[in-house]
């Protein structure tokens, strides 16, 4: 049994998906723009200019706070965070220090079937910094270029309590938080693109102790896997140092993905190192109860609530419901297909399960193979088109295996199912006379399997059905094929 307990807290920076920057009207579409084109005197930090607060960013932060059960402050203000770094255009960052927009909240995560409640310390608003590009000249000498397009993009920082005890809990927390941000529509929350960034604070202490150990901040993690690996590495490193009687320094370390290790970058700063003071160019904000309730009324159904509805209302398993609600767009697509479905000829629970199987299985498989999301998929295969394909399967016009290939063609070409089936001659063969001829040939070609069946090894019927499917190029109705084979074998 381990002597140490790991303590992890996360600071997550979420780029808000607003059209303009936090304190000016410059566009936030910096990713596809030429460097240093979406700039103005305000985000350049020129003397004498005055910032103005982006109302949409404030509303997005309140919305996020409500979704995470936070207390929304009736009074909040901005502060100057002072530090020297080349990507900080003003020489300070406009942030929030002692009076953040959102206070205490929580996020529940499920790890191996156990629900863990992770506390949220605060959520505050600030501006992003410019982006440094590190290059080398023809002689191998390093130099850096500065792209100011990202400077002053609205940034929301979600700070957790140090409530996580394993790297896996940290990963689950991040994944759940990202899903909520995407459901709310406040951010694309893409780690690889930098719109969802995480710094982790990790320490160890003897099991049973209540006082926190020396805190190490880990940076430069741009994927969920990197966060997990960095924390796992740091956990092992710190425990080894403690076992060897070495002092663990409070410092900032960077994750090196290619070497799978953390390296020391600098000593960890304290709040007083930043010399915070109130931002003199921005008035405090008074958040009225009416404003909060207006925003609350706009909240969408959140993933956990939607998952419970799918389980209780659609009779889905927790596994299927979790997969379907992992993305708001995927859940919307699933419900849109259901809305097109006529359950008159089949039990509703069976029909819902069939739709869920197709969306979770075949649709997800096509998206993963093609690197597309459900929005792109729906442009080629609308909910009505998928529903029509399932109707053809239910009516026996095409079998399930062939239908999966048809769905792939529908996505590739944008054509409807019937056109593809007719063009490629994929209609299911349900005519008994035609299938009897195929069955006779299969039995004649496989005397060993016939002998095994007659000896009581009835499981070989599956092999024989497979041979009929092969002979018919996947068009044989598998249920009728099995009946005909059994009848022929019983009759000898």
Curated annotation (Swiss-Prot):
Protein name: Aspartyl/glutamyl-tRNA(Asn/Gln) amidotransferase subunit B
EC class: ligase
Molecular-function GO term, any one: ATP binding
S-S bridge residues: none
PANTHER family membership: GLUTAMYL-TRNA GLN AMIDOTRANSFERASE SUBUNIT B MITOCHONDRIAL AND PROKARYOTIC PET112-RELATED (PTHR11659), GLUTAMYL-TRNA(GLN) AMIDOTRANSFERASE SUBUNIT B, MITOCHONDRIAL (PTHR11659:SF0)
Gene3D superfamilies the UniProt entry points to: 1.10.10.410, GatB domain, N-terminal subdomain
One Pfam family per UniProt: GatB_Yqey
Subunit structure of this chain's protein: Heterotrimer of A, B and C subunits.
Enzyme Commission identifier(s): 6.3.5.-
Phylogenetic classification of the source organism: Bacteria, Bacillati, Chloroflexota, Dehalococcoidia, Dehalococcoidales
Sorted UniProt keywords: ATP-binding, Ligase, Nucleotide-binding, Protein biosynthesis
Reaction equations catalysed: L-glutamyl-tRNA(Gln) + L-glutamine + ATP + H2O = L-glutaminyl-tRNA(Gln) + L-glutamate + ADP + phosphate + H(+); L-aspartyl-tRNA(Asn) + L-glutamine + ATP + H2O = L-asparaginyl-tRNA(Asn) + L-glutamate + ADP + phosphate + 2 H(+)
Domain of life: Bacteria
Endpoints of the signal sequence: none
Free-text function comment from the UniProt entry: Allows the formation of correctly charged Asn-tRNA(Asn) or Gln-tRNA(Gln) through the transamidation of misacylated Asp-tRNA(Asn) or Glu-tRNA(Gln) in organisms which lack either or both of asparaginyl-tRNA or glutaminyl-tRNA synthetases. The reaction takes place in the presence of glutamine and ATP through an activated phospho-Asp-tRNA(Asn) or phospho-Glu-tRNA(Gln).
GO biological process, one term: glutaminyl-tRNAGln biosynthesis via transamidation
Organism: Dehalococcoides mccartyi (strain CBDB1)
Family indicated by similarity: Belongs to the GatB/GatE family. GatB subfamily.
Keyword Magnesium on entry: no
